[in-house]
Amino acid sequence: VMKMTSKQNILITGSNGGIGSSISKLLAKDNENLFLLYNKNNDKILELENTYDSVKIIKTDISNSVELNNTLKNIISENSIDVFIHSPAYPIQHSDILKLNWEIFQQQLNLHLKSFFEISKFVVPQMKSNNHGKIISILTSYVVGRPPNLLADYVVAKHALLGMMKCMANELGSSGICVNSISPSMVDTPLTESLPKKLKEIYQSQVPLEKRLAKPIDVANIVQFLCSENANYITGENILVSGGSTMH
């Protein structure tokens, strides 16, 4: 049995993305108090707010520091966050590394790393005072082994998050805070729908387990586990969810 602590206050970024919405739906069913941040669309999570009293959706551009800070102040003035899940979704563009300009790297770093850092600075003091907390970021299996071509801005931003996760796990462990990441291989989401069919078929054929892409629920199930008491002695881990396509 998955041992869930009593109702937790959980903050989720990218909550309307393919993975984020799957996480949100699963944790809503666990009756957790959810604060779901989204930027553009809320079509996948609107029904959650209408179905569950414990779900609140909030429009916020997390790469905009001022907007993010205002949202966080409002949330933490009345709620102590127990779990922070970082799952920002951003359309992936393929580009030769030398054709990228620094602004594109900066854009990815702002979305993935800067927002993660800024949110952590808000929620970690609360977690420290409770001597308990969970921080989970969604990365990519591309941070392990050889990266693919043409995705340098995305891969570099995810590597930066991996480094931040390890540093935070190391420094916050004494306060009872677990910091981990999950690295899925290619996931069947709106973000990957635009990829050429042939590319996806080649990729699937190389996955040992069931020759299929990862599903959002495959990732959400691991998030649910990390949120539970069963994972209270796991920190500093990057958990691969890749059907065996990446091993280390």
Residue ranges of predicted features:
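A conserved structural motif in NAD(P)-dependent oxidoreductases
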Residues: 208-219, 230
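Short C-terminal tail/terminal secondary-structure segment
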Residues: 224, 235-248
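Conserved glycine-rich cofactor-binding loop
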Residues: 16-17
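Catalytic loop of short-chain dehydrogenase/reductase
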Residues: 90, 134-160, 165-174, 186
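Short, small/polar-rich loop/turn modules that mediate ligand/substrate recognition or access, typified
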Residues: 173, 178, 234-236
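Alpha-helical segment proximal to the catalytic Tyr-Lys
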Residues: 125, 170-171, 232
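Catalytic Tyr-X3-Lys loop
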Residues: 98-117, 132, 136, 161
